[in-house]
Structure formats: C-alpha cells, structure tokens
UniProtKB/Swiss-Prot annotation:
PANTHER family: SERINE CARBOXYPEPTIDASE CTSA-1.2, SERINE PROTEASE FAMILY S10 SERINE CARBOXYPEPTIDASE. This is Serine carboxypeptidase ctsa-1.2. The keyword Translocase does not apply. SUPFAM superfamilies: alpha/beta-Hydrolases (SSF53474). The lineage of its organism: Eukaryota, Metazoa, Ecdysozoa, Nematoda, Chromadorea.
C-alpha cells in the first residue's frame, strides 16, 4: 500500500509539473487576466513525428463546470492563433503588433477553449523529420490524438461538456474529427456534446452551385449573360442548376469558371465582398491566386496566404521573441506565419461533402450542431450553408426568422429537430464572423452552448 501510494503521488506530482510547465505566467503586451492559460505541444502521428502546438485559455467564469471547446481554423494550412487573437479570444491584437486589448465579447467568458495549430507544418506546429505530408483522415486522427493527450494532461476537464468548433475548411476538419471521436470512444471516451462550424466549406459541389447564384443575386453577373446561361445551361431553373458538373471547356463551364475568377481574382475581398481589399498586406502581394479545392474543377481555394486581409499585426505579435518565449516555442523554429503554402499545396483533400458524417453525429449520436455564416462571405457563402443544412432532410421545427442583438437584427435563424440543429446567418459579416460582428458571434455561440433562445 505504501508503494502504491508513492507511485500515485509521483504520478500526481508529475502531472502538476506538466501543467505548470505549460502555464503562461506573463504574456507580453496583454492586459491582466483573471484566468489561467497554457501553451505547449502534443506529440502525435503513427511515427510520433508531429508536434502539434496548442494554446489553451480557461473559462473566466467557472472552468470546473463550463464547457470545453476545441477550435480548428481551416485553410487547409492556416493557424488558429489568428482566430484566438483577432476573432473570439480574450484579447484582440492592436495595430501596433506589440500589444493586446481585452475583447469584451470573448467566448471564454464562460467556456474554456483549446486552440490547436493543425496539421503539423501550420503555425508553430512542426514535424521532427520535416515530413508534413498529410490529408483529411490523417489530420482527423492526429487531432484526436492531441485531444486524448489534452484530457490526460488536464483530467479535471474530462467530465465537462465538450464541443468541436471551427471555421472555413473547418467544415471538413470538424465533422471528420467528430466522426473519429465517435469511432474511437471505446479507446478513449470523450464527453462530446456537439459541433459548431462558422462559414464552413461543407460541400464542394454545393459551394460551386451556390456561389454562382450568390454572385448573380448580389449584382455581380451581367443580366444578359445570366439569361443566356439560364436557358442554355439550366433549363430556366438556376436554383437547381448543377453548375459544378459542366465541362471546363464548354460554354457553361467557362461561365462558371468566370464567376470563380470574379470571386477570387477580380479585385473583390473574397472574405467580405463589401469590405475593402487591403493591398498593403503581405499576402496580397502574392496576388489573388487560387487552386482547386478537393481536386475538382471550378472550386477555388486561397493559397496559404490570406488575400485582402492585413495579417501583419498578429504576425508581428506572435513573432516577438518574448512572446515566443512565453509560449514555449523552440528557438529553432522559423517565424510564425498565418498560413502555410506547403500545407495548402500538398494537403490531400479526401472528402467533398460532409452530409453522412453530420447525419451520423446528429441522428445516430444525438449531438447538437450549429452552422453559422456571415452573409457577405464569398469563400464559403451563406447560401451553401443554408442549402447543405436543408438537404440533410431533418424535421423543420423553426422556420427562418430574424433574431436581435442589442436592439438590432443580428441575422436569421432556422432550426431542425427541436433546437438540435441550427443554421444561422449573421447580417453584414464575412468569413470571420467574430471579427466582423463580435457581439452577434457571442450571442449565437451562447445560444448554442447553453440552449438559450435566439
């Protein structure tokens, strides 16, 4: 018995050491905070060659009972640290790139949030053997490994409600990870309750079909050209038109290609069509380039850069030597960048539609789900989200209606299966909803997590 107790004590002391060694005690340029935060690495992969960097902020309210969220930024190849410091995190980076200010609409006011830079090669995550080749299945598996490591490092959170959340290509990351969690519950049980996806690219074909219509209804497509395509390509039904199916070398295909070019290479800000395009940003200098998402025609994908957005403040902040030291980043690693071209180019996109995984989560495992879209985003437009959700075939329980935040219409919400599945649009927001409309973003995540009425 004495030996057993000694071993337990050693284990407990070892656990305390792991947590405290990852504790961020002084974050440069940040206001004084009332919550704990941690930064570290999880070693994952079949060869244990991938080191995934995480940044974990505890809830400002009651971390022992508040839900735990995982956040995954998309790309593929972009870092969640940008979201933490410019979207929903406890601080927003100032334009000086040296200091942070308190975010009054932070999601960690009553939720603890784990941000994972994934896959390896993104941000401060790296491969010990420099092999960062990966794809959807491997990323989901390694993210699951990181989650298991997280709950081993912080076992006090194993009983808390857990949600997987993300943005953009998170429309693939999130459902594939949720499926992996459900498939591996016998190996390591995770108390998952739901998933939330912001402006998620959840269907490649629907993304193409909806964007063509979205651009027309926003006054971007020439009327005479539209009428011609309507009759010659779509049998006078543009809503049901399979724009994605046309050959690239046909007249219909060339029209579809032209609309994609307009969205991504025509001078518009693809992340907020009514916002200015900031041509001074480092990423803009790469041009409004694109490649094929999911290896299919017509479907654009921003390279490992972020066109039209000025990411220099967050980049400058995360590359400060004292910030790197506070986060425990190895000095041998190169400078942080918001996105990785290497990941974006080499990533194996294995799935083009998330319908089956979402239905498995909702119907077979009773998980909650929310899809929310800024309504002026071109990258993953709101019409795609609406069509995807509606085509799940779930029982409609609340027809589309507006909701208000601070006395103003924040957007529109539709619910299915009671309130188990929610689709919400955010008025005037682009791709990064918490950046454009922080109060509305806080409202919808609170409604989702705590079953509050919209």
């Amino acid at each position: 018995m004495v030996m057993s107790r000694t071993l337990v004590l050693v284990a407990l002391l070892g656990f305390a050491y792991v947590c405290e060694s990852a504790l961020i005690t002084n974050l440069p340029g940040a206001p004084i905070s009332n919550f704990k935060q941690y930064s570290g690495y999880y070693n994952v992969g079949t060869k244990k060659n991938h080191m995934l960097h995480y940044w974990f902020v505890e809830s400002q309210s009651n971390p022992s009972t508040d839900p735990v969220l995982l956040w995954l930024t998309g790309g593929p190849g972009c870092s969640g640290l940008s979201a933490l410091l410019t979207e929903w995190g406890p601080w927003n980076v100032n334009t000086d790139g040296a200091t942070l200010r308190t975010n009054p609409y932070s999601w960690n006011k009553n939720a603890s949030i784990l941000t994972l830079e994934a896959p390896a090669g993104v941000g401060y995550s790296y491969a010990t053997d420099n092999n960062i080749a990966t794809g959807d299945d491997q990323t989901a598996s390694e993210n699951w490994e990181a989650l298991v490591a997280f709950f081993n490092e912080f076992p006090q959170y194993k009983g808390n409600d857990f949600y997987v959340t993300g943005e953009s290509y998170g429309g693939i990351y999130v459902p594939t990870l949720v499926q992996t969690i459900l498939d591996r519950q016998s190996q390591s049980h995770i108390n998952i309750k739901g998933l939330a996806i912001g402006n998620g690219c959840v269907s490649a074909n629907e993304g193409v079909d909806s964007l063509v219509n979205f651009l027309y209804h926003h006054g971007v497509v020439d009327q005479a050209k539209w009428e011609h395509m309507k009759t010659s390509c779509c049998h006078n039904d543009t809503d049901a038109c399979p724009w994605h199916s046309f050959s690239e070398f046909s007249a219909c295909g060339e029209f579809v290609e032209a609309t994609q070019q307009t969205a991504w290479n025509g001078g518009l800000n693809p992340y907020n069509m009514y916002a200015d395009c900031i041509s001074t940003s480092a990423s803009f200098r790469f041009g409004m380039e694109y490649e094929r998402r999911f290896n299919k025609k017509y479907t654009p994908e921003v390279l490992g850069t972020v066109p039209c957005l000025d990411e220099s403040p967050v980049t400058n902040y995360l590359n400060r030597q004292d910030v790197r030291k506070a986060l425990g980043i190895p000095s041998s690693l190169p400078a942080w960048s918001i996105c990785s071209n290497a990941i974006s180019y080499g990533y194996k996109r294995q799935y083009g539609d998330m319908t089956s995984r979402v239905l498995n989560a909702v119907n077979n495992n009773n998980l909650k789900m929310m899809l929310y879209n800024g309504d002026v985003d071109l990258a993953c437009n709101a019409l795609m989200g609406q069509r995807f959700t509606d085509k799940l075939g779930l029982t409609l329980s609340k027809k589309k209606t507006h909701f208000t935040v601070k006395g103003q219409i924040g957007g529109y919400v539709t619910q299915y299966k009671g309130s188990q599945v929610t689709f919400a649009t955010v008025r005037g927001a682009g791709h990064m909803v918490p950046t454009d409309k922080p109060a509305v973003a806080e409202h919808i995540i609170q409604s989702f997590l705590f079953n509050k009425a919209f």
